[in-house]
Amino acid sequence: MFKSERVFDDNLLLSYFDDGYISDRIAIKDSEIHVWFLDIGNYDEYHMKSLFDILTLDEKAKMSHYVHVADQKRFLVGHSMLRILLSRYLAREPTDIILLNSKHGKLYMPQSNVSFNISHSGNRVALAFVKEKKIGVD
């Protein structure tokens, strides 16, 4: 089930889900920050396979370089859910999302008014989104 709650001065929307459902379209206002928290433990083998199919060949190759399975899972969930959420914000297919690396290695989406950042620790992944601004989450 998808859940959201506003915190601080109602401009920060904390979003999370525990059954894998995300609506087809997500709107983000100029004044909002959306932060999604994902628990890798909630994804079974079937969901992992579906998420793997969303990644590009380059992302799959990068994922395969991780030695530990836990690191591979973090990468898989983080990057595929990033694509899924961006697709909902921008009304595109997840596989049509083009992600590039900046000169400092930070992912970004060219020619988009939605900025994002990804962070992970243990079994958790955090994805933050904002419109017309830059964002970082750690």
Model-derived segments and their meaning:
Residues 1-137:
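Core catalytic alpha/beta fold that binds nucleotide/phospho-ligands
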